[in-house]
């Protein structure tokens, strides 16, 4: 697996792929993003977890947790498209962190509705989940709609401010599906608040084939019964390998 520095370099090297998703002046966004990243990577060192039990909250979307939905032929309750709960990135992250303390827990929460409609109350969505957590991972952005991209930086800042009311240790990940403007909004917030940040779009850019599920692949439903992937919605999400790389990327900077 690529290290954090190598991953950031990979992101910079694959910007042409991401540019298709940004506005005409996206090249300026790339220059700004890389300048901020260069400063951040010089300061950002791998942190060694202590032996205390940690309570981690992963705030995300369908990549973090998706409940069963007949509408998209998804009958599981984990990060989409992990084949089993224990193989999504939150469970893999928990397993990695339990090497330091077996009582560490990682809890997922899906706020995709807030991504699409940031006027929703964060307190209603997150208060109970955030209570008692000492690490919060914010892993969002893919569901921000085109008309919401311009305000994503401001809305993400509001989410960070809310989470800071519960813990000072907040980690931001980048986008899984490359999008330069959204990524820059995340990087700027990480820089502004002095937060740890890890890009993950290099997984999609460099390892899309091996990290994406295929139609007909086997998944397991909430009762452990196998079923096969049908339809396009699940196919764009990370499979077990992609989930593992996301988990290891987050773990490497905790």
For every predicted segment, state its role:
Residues 39-40, 50, 55-57, 65-149:
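Conserved SGNH/GDSL esterase-like catalytic core that processes O-acyl groups on lipids
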Residues 1-59, 63-82, 99, 179, ...:
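N-terminal secretory targeting modules
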Residues 104-109, 114, 243-254:
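Extended amphipathic secondary-structure runs
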Residues 1-17, 89, 114-115, 128-136, ...:
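Generic low-polarity alpha-helical segments
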Residues 120-253:
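Alpha-helical cap/lid subdomain in secreted, periplasmic
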Residues 22-35, 85-97, 118-127, 177-188:
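Short, charge-rich amphipathic segments
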Residues 16, 21, 30, 34, ...:
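Detector for Asparagine
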């Amino acid at each position: 697996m690529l290290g954090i520095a190598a991953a950031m370099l990979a992101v910079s090297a694959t910007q042409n792929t991401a540019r298709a998703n940004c506005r005409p002046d996206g090249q300026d966004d790339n220059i700004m993003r890389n300048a901020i990243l260069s400063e951040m990577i010089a300061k950002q060192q791998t942190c060694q977890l202590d032996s205390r039990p940690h309570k981690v909250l992963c705030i995300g979307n369908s990549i973090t947790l998706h409940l069963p939905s007949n509408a998209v032929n998804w009958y599981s309750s984990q990060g989409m498209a992990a084949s089993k709960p224990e193989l999504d990135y939150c469970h893999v992250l928990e397993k990695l962190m339990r090497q330091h303390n077996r009582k560490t827990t990682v809890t997922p929460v899906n706020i995709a509705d807030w991504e699409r409609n940031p006027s929703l109350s964060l307190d209603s969505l997150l208060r109970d989940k955030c209570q008692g957590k000492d690490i919060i991972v914010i892993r969002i952005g893919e569901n921000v709609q085109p008309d919401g991209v311009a305000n994503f930086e401001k809305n993400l800042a509001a989410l960070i401010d809310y989470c800071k009311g519960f813990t000072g240790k907040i980690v931001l990940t980048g986008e899984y599906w490359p999008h330069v403007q959204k990524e820059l909004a995340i990087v700027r917030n990480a820089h502004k608040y002095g937060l740890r940040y890890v890009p993950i779009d290099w997984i999609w850019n460099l390892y899309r084939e091996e990290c994406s599920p295929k139609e007909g692949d086997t998944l397991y439903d909430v009762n452990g019964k196998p079923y096969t992937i049908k339809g396009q919605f699940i196919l764009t999400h990370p499979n077990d390998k992609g989930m593992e790389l996301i988990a290891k990327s987050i773990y490497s900077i905790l």
